[in-house]
Swiss-Prot record:
Family: Belongs to the fic family.
Record's subunit section: Homodimer.
Protein known as: Protein adenylyltransferase Fic
Regulation: The side chain of Glu-204 determines which of the two opposing activities (AMPylase or de-AMPylase) will take place. In response to endoplasmic reticulum stress, mediates de-AMPylase activity. Adenylyltransferase activity is inhibited by the inhibitory helix present at the N-terminus: Glu-204 binds ATP and competes with ATP-binding at Arg-344, thereby preventing adenylyltransferase activity. In unstressed cells, disengagement of Glu-204 promotes adenylyltransferase activity.
Fido domain location: 255-390
Native organism: Nematostella vectensis (Starlet sea anemone)
Motif range (Inhibitory (S/T)XXXE(G/N) motif): 200-205
Any Gene Ontology CC annotation: membrane
Length: 427
């Protein structure tokens, strides 16, 4: 996945120079395996605490969009907005939603379109409305209407986010109370291990099935009809997961960039040994994102390391800290390949150190994952954090279902079966 995106970015480089904009970031979706040892730490449920914005903005330049620049779709977007407003006042809300969405897709940085759509949604979806107000402020930081709307919506959004994190913490505590040595928990951990490797590699284009992945990890035997590279990707992620589980989650000190390099060394150790654990020496392009130049990598990574060791993580909820760490690393993109996988391992190491199981991002969720990262690139990291939170909750639910006996046909049983289904109609 990483290599494909780099090639696509190279083809679009001239377009990037002409547009002179920094837009969507697409990265590989990487996961880790369930921990053998979880250490429960106290967590503070916060959203936008002191230092949160500073932590987010470190290493990431401010991005503003000139709403006055009209492209060929500008007029069409305003026409859709006008039609949406008419449908809204006529009580035809379903049609209004489609027209608002069309207007936003045609002019995604136009403040008036974002504001009107947000005001339309606020009563029924205040989280999405506040996100639209935030996007309007990114396009025009001095927009008084956008400021007023966001100030009105933000307290409600903070309360909802707080409730979401509290709910996940309660489920984490319930899971933590189950003996790690119990047979159901051991089975759940083992199955999750294979699930993580399978989904991680599938998202990057690896065609190994779940059963093939399990066979390679358990026997180290080759699977007929599959490339050496695909085998090596499975072996590399297997070693990286073992390193995270046996070393990082039991480490008393904070995670540093040295640990990140060690993760990467194992991720690419079989597939690309010459690049494993080394910063890139060439410029790369990831979709529409242009990472820092090679000569700036050491400075950027040192700044990232300073942030990891600072007091900022202590005021963040572990899910926020983990998601931010992941985002910062993929933004820098310090390696030629394997950045997404390494960032996901870093994120899950942070979660496990706080008593959470590692997040499972399913192959079929990749589109949403890319979209939330794209939104982060445009100034709002919170949709990405919420996505990570939902994935964390779903993972905990799967563990609880695996370790609880339910009657055949019970809703929980069906959920667990769906979570473990390796088939995907898109593959």
């Amino acid at each position: 996945m990483d290599s494909t995106q780099i090639k696509q970015g190279n083809l679009r480089y001239l377009i990037h120079l002409l547009l002179a904009s920094l837009a969507g970031l697409s990265i590989a979706i990487i996961v880790t395996h369930a921990p053998v040892f979880w250490r429960l730490r106290s967590s503070k449920n916060t959203l936008d605490p002191p230092g949160f914005r500073e932590g987010l903005n470190m290493l990431i330049p401010e991005i503003h969009f000139d709403a006055e620049v009209q492209d060929p779709l500008y007029g069409e977007a305003l026409a859709a907005l006008k039609a949406a407003s008419a449908m809204k006042h006529g009580g035809k809300h379903s049609k209004a939603v489609k027209l608002f969405q069309q207007a936003v897709s045609l002019a995604p940085h136009h403040p008036e379109i974002l504001l009107q759509y947000g005001e339309f949604l606020e009563q029924h979806d205040v989280v999405q409305a506040e996100h639209l107000y935030n996007r309007a402020l990114t396009a025009n930081p001095l927009d008084s209407r956008a400021l007023a709307n966001r100030q009105r919506a933000l307290p409600k959004v903070k309360q909802l986010d707080q409730e979401m994190l509290d709910k996940i913490d309660e489920k984490r505590d319930k899971l933590f109370s189950i003996p790690a040595g119990s047979l159901p928990m051991k089975r759940a951990i083992k199955e999750a291990y294979f699930q993580h490797i399978y989904h991680s590699n599938a998202i990057e284009g690896n065609t190994m099935t779940l059963s093939m992945t399990r066979a390679i990890v358990e026997t180290k035997m080759a699977v007929p009809g599959k490339s050496i590279l695909e085998h090596n990707e499975v072996l590399g992620l297997d070693e990286a997961l073992k390193y995270v589980n046996s070393t990082l989650i039991q480490k008393s000190e904070s995670i540093t960039i040295d640990d990140i390099i060690e993760i990467h060394r194992r991720v690419l150790g079989h597939a690309h040994p010459l690049e494993a654990g080394r910063y890139r020496s060439t410029q790369v392009f990831v979709s529409d994102h242009v990472p820092p130049a090679p000569e700036d990598l050491e400075k950027q990574m040192n700044a990232f390391n300073d942030w990891l060791l600072s007091k900022d993580p202590e005021i963040l909820h572990p899910i926020e800290f983990a998601a931010l760490s992941h985002y910062k690393l993929v933004y820098i993109h310090p390696f030629t390949d394997g950045n997404g996988r390494t960032a996901r391992l870093l994120m899950n190491a942070i979660l496990m150190r706080a008593g959470f199981p590692p997040v499972i991002i399913r192959f079929q969720d990749r589109h949403d994952y890319y979209e939330y990262l794209n939104q982060a690139n445009h100034g709002d990291i919170r949709p990405f954090i919420r996505f990570v939170a939902r994935c964390t909750e779903r993972t905990i639910d799967a563990y609880l279902a695996s370790t609880t006996i339910y009657p055949l046909g019970h809703e929980r049983t069906r959920e667990l079966t769906d979570a473990h289904d390796e088939k995907d109609p898109n593959r």
